[in-house]
UniProtKB/Swiss-Prot annotation:
Family: Belongs to the SecA family.
Species the sequence originates in: Bacillus cereus (strain B4264)
Function: Part of the Sec protein translocase complex. Interacts with the SecYEG preprotein conducting channel. Has a central role in coupling the hydrolysis of ATP to the transfer of proteins into and across the cell membrane, serving as an ATP-driven molecular motor driving the stepwise translocation of polypeptide chains across the membrane.
Residues that bind Zn(2+): 819, 821, 830-831
UniProt protein name: Protein translocase subunit SecA
Entry keyword Protein transport: yes
Region called Disordered, residue ranges: 788-807
NCBIfam families (UniProt xref): PRK09200.1, PRK12904.1, secA
Protein keywords: ATP-binding, Cell membrane, Cytoplasm, Membrane, Metal-binding, Nucleotide-binding, Protein transport, Translocase, Translocation, Transport, Zinc
Subcellular location(s) of the protein: Cell membrane; Cytoplasm
Cofactor(s) it depends on: Zn(2+)
GO biological process: intracellular protein transmembrane transport; protein import; protein targeting; protein transport by the Sec complex
Entry EC number(s): 7.4.2.8
PROSITE patterns, A to Z: SECA, SECA_MOTOR_DEAD
Length: 835
């Protein structure tokens, strides 16, 4: 009954039947494609491109295009895709995952949808797990695409920007997932659009899709950098701020907690640091450090806002009074307080840009993937990536013998049995592949085999090129290969002619916590209808067994008087192992889903900033955008200084001081003018005055220079604030889980606080851009500059996120050294005077 119901409701079977009809259409075209000459076959590419411009779609072209690729593959590669490979290609073209068993020719299958989608001219990315496979596939399958008149590029980590641009400009680009992600991040840090390497993300086919979208989903790609100069600048700024007097050199509004330099304070700073104009663009960092130093001394109070504990500044939660260890103030305020209190200044390496593979690959217009094992993660692929898993039938029936697990009482008994099995099979000449979960296990088995005099190869993921050679030899007579965690995926184990009748023996030394990894190991045997055998050896001391209560089973084995050499073969134990694996997979899926929910907060913010950066880069005139920022800044300032209900309590003097100091000239806005107006009427005359001053500034220089000046200011401010914001979000994320103890949902809290921080950053960007546009003097040799030099942090091999290391620095400037502020004078005659 269940079997009948399965057939009726089997979605996969219905998909296969539907695709079978398309395969028949492709087969029917063979008679008209086969007689074509090489030139005529190549000419089909141009014909298809023209038909696309006339309104046909890639779906309309599919049968013909696939028939053309099949014929070209036969001529160029000597390989003719089978019907099941055509099905796999259709599934990929439709944006799904093709589950094709090992040895069924996934690489050749991918050429079909790659060719079809490359006809649009928008670019197709073929994604692999390592550069060796990318180079191999680009050179082997590239011949086929080039024969048909398409261009093929390969994107490697070692390439220059120009080489990468060329690779991405090709119709088809082969690359690793890491390199694609890093290039995307780097493209959103460049200052000129000519420096971008990637085109809009159109279509990607991911090889070993489960490895990239599931196993590596929790590993973020990070570009980090270090603000080298700032540590000394905090100390100089701190020394300078100590010399300032309240009301004379700076003004402080108790209600708004706003502190700023007065005209006298600005003059004092210019004298102290030997500069002409504090608001000059080249002194952005200095002004920022002075402002934060002021906030540290005037706004932040020891034992109220923070405490000093064991040489560190620890924030005090204003609502609960609890210490918030591990949290740091953003925008350099924390370092300014460290300078104020005389503790060591920790200048952490900053995260300049970050993205997870989940969010990177979800940006593609269409995404598909192929692997031998995806069905167990079908729910995840559907919910997160909107891709269905379609299991493609094998070309020949699988005749592999998958044996029931053998369970031993102890690890020692298990390993003895494993080695004995290997030795027996080796004597008969049968090739053996031994799969281990940990490197230590592979080394232990290697030692035991060496003692028995059995020659063998060890394979772990250290050398991709050598890895392929070892895997290629793993199917010859008498070969013994030990592989850790299925290193060597992507390369087939081909059987030697003299062992075709016995096939490969695959021995698993313990169950992985994921059924998918076990299935990958099993799938190495019995490819393309070959014979083969798979056997897993388990012990009651294995981690998975221990984790899910093997004590009862062990006690039963003791009661039955079973020793280490006697295994039990029990369906009950096998079912228990499988249910344990399902539980672990469920937990891991929940963890990845939760990561995505957190990362989505930053994703939305990242998309806003990157989109605006792109617009700035491509825009010829930013004046309209900047006027909008000035308007917002003025409206916020008016609202902040007139928030009290009673008119007498409005701080009009503070508003006038703020406007004349930060945006206009002394006397441009007068108190008596504003006092006659309601708050909603105040902004208009102020904005009119700002635009008048803006127009005056425009007349002082050629238009081209003014437009470039605007871009320099916008890039400098946006990039500085955005990198500080990412860092602050990092710190928020690290401490947010502690909120769960207070019966608060950490995710909701992270979303709310993250949004508030983003809004605050946007306001800060608008205010700072307005200030620099109005106050900075424009130099002749304007140049856009990177705020911090970024460096890609490659994910560690064990999949853990690369941790940020604090860099602790003291004052390292000698009295006779050149001053770090860039004046060219000796430290003792420059910033050293202030101290």
């Amino acid at each position: 009954m269940i079997g009948i119901l399965k057939k009726v409701f089997d979605v996969n079977q219905r998909q296969i039947k539907r695709m079978q009809k398309t395969v028949e259409q492709i087969d029917a075209l063979e008679s008209s494609i086969k007689p074509l000459t090489d030139e005529q076959l190549k000419g089909k590419t141009l014909e298809f491109k023209e038909r696309l411009t006339k309104g046909e779609t890639v779906d309309d072209l599919l049968p013909e295009a696939f028939a053309v690729v099949r014929e070209a593959a036969t001529r160029v590669l000597g390989m003719r895709p089978y019907g099941v490979q055509l099905m796999g290609g259709i599934a990929l073209h439709e944006g799904n995952i093709s589950e094709m068993k090992t040895g069924e020719g996934k690489t050749l299958t991918s050429t079909l949808p790659v060719y079809l989608n490359a006809l649009t001219g928008k670019g197709v990315h073929v994604v692999t797990v390592n550069e060796y496979l990318a180079q191999r596939d680009a050179s082997e399958m590239g011949q086929l695409h080039e024969f048909l008149g398409l261009t093929v590029g390969i994107n490697l980590n070692s390439m220059s920007r120009e080489e990468k641009q060329e690779a991405y400009a090709a119709d088809i680009t082969y690359s690793t997932n890491n390199e694609l992600g890093f290039d995307y991040l780097r493209d959103n840090m460049v200052l000129y659009k000519e420096q971008c390497v990637q085109r809009p993300l159109h279509f990607a086919i991911i090889d070993e899709v489960d490895s990239i979208l599931v196993d590596e989903a929790r590993t973020p790609l990070i570009i980090s950098g270090q603000a080298q100069k700032s540590t000394e600048l905090y100390m100089f700024a701190n020394a300078f701020v100590r010399t300032l007097e309240n009301e004379k050199d700076y003004s402080f509004d108790v209600k708004t907690k706003n502190v700023m330099l007065t005209e006298d304070g600005i003059t004092k700073a210019e004298k102290a640091f030997h500069i002409e104009n504090l608001f000059d663009l080249k002194h952005v960092a200095l002004l920022h450090h002075i402002n934060q130093g002021l906030r540290a001394h005037v706004v932040m109070h020891r034992d109220t806002d923070y405490v000093v504990q064991e040489g560190e500044i620890v924030i005090v939660d204003q609502f609960t009074g609890r210490l918030m260890k591990g949290r740091r103030y953003s925008e350099g305020l924390h370092q300014a307080i460290e300078a104020k209190e005389g503790v060591e200044i920790q200048n952490e390496s900053m995260t300049l840009a970050t993205i997870t593979f989940q969010n990177y690959f979800r940006m593609y217009e269409k995404l598909s993937g192929m692997t031998g094992t995806a069905k167990t993660e079908e729910e995840e692929f559907r919910n997160i990536y909107n891709m269905n898993v379609i299991v493609i039938p094998t070309n020949k029936p699988i005749i592999r013998d998958d044996r029931a697990d053998l369970i031993f009482k102890s690890m020692e008994g298990k390993f003895n049995a494993v080695v004995e099995d290997i030795v027996n099979r080796h004597k008969k000449g049968q090739p053996v592949l031994v799969g281990t979960v940990a490197i230590e296990t592979s080394e232990l088995i290697s030692k035991m085999l060496t003692r028995k005099g059995v020659r063998h190869n060890i394979l772990n993921a250290k050398n991709h090129a050598r890895e392929a050679d070892i895997i290629a030899e793993a199917g010859i007579k008498g070969a013994v290969t030990i592989a850790t965690n299925m290193a060597g995926r992507g390369t087939d184990i081909k059987l030697g002619d003299d062992v075709k009748n016995v096939g490969l023996a695959v021995i698993g030394t313990e169950r992985h916590e994921s059924r998918r990894i076990d299935n990958q190991l099993r799938g190495r045997a019995g490819r393309q209808g070959d014979p083969g055998v798979t056997q897993f050896y388990l012990s009651m001391e294995d981690e998975l067994m221990r984790r899910f209560g093997s004590d009862n089973m062990k006690a039963m084995m003791d009661r039955l008087g079973m020793d280490d050499s006697q295994p039990i073969e029990s369906k009950m134990v096998s079912r228990a192992v499988e249910s344990a694996q399902k539980r672990v997979e469920g937990n891991n899926y929940d963890a990845r889903k939760q990561l995505l929910q957190y990362d989505d907060v930053l994703r939305q913010q990242r998309e806003v900033i990157y989109k605006q950066r792109q617009e700035v880069m491509e825009s010829d005139n930013l004046r309209g955008i900047i006027e909008g920022m000035m308007k917002s800044t003025v409206e916020r300032a008016v609202a902040l200084h007139t928030q009290e209900e009673i008119e007498e309590d409005w701080n009009i003097k503070g508003l006038v001081d703020y406007l004349n100091t930060n945006l206009l000239q002394d006397g441009d806005v007068k108190e008596e003018e504003l006092r006659r107006l309601a708050p909603e009427e105040m902004s208009e005359p102020i904005i009119a005055k700002l635009i008048e001053r803006y127009n005056e500034k425009e007349k002082l220089m050629p238009e081209e220079q003014m437009r470039e000046f605007e871009k320099v200011v916008v890039f400098r401010v946006v990039d500085t604030k955005w990198t500080e914001h990412i860092d602050a979000m990092d710190h928020l994320r690290e401490g947010i889980h502690l909120r769960a103890y207070g019966q608060i949902d950490p995710l909701r809290e992270y979303q709310m606080e993250g949004f508030a921080m983003f809004e605050s950053m946007v306001a800060s960007i608008e205010e700072e851009i307005s200030r620099y546009i109005m106050k900075a003097e424009i130099e002749q040799n304007l140049e856009r500059q990177e705020v911090v030099q970024g460096e890609a942090v490659h994910p560690s091999s064990d999949g853990e996120e690369a941790k940020k290391k604090p860099v602790v620095k003291g004052d390292q400037v000698g009295r006779n050294d050149l001053c770090k502020c860039g004046s060219g004078k000796k430290y003792k005659n420059c910033c050293g005077i202030v101290q």
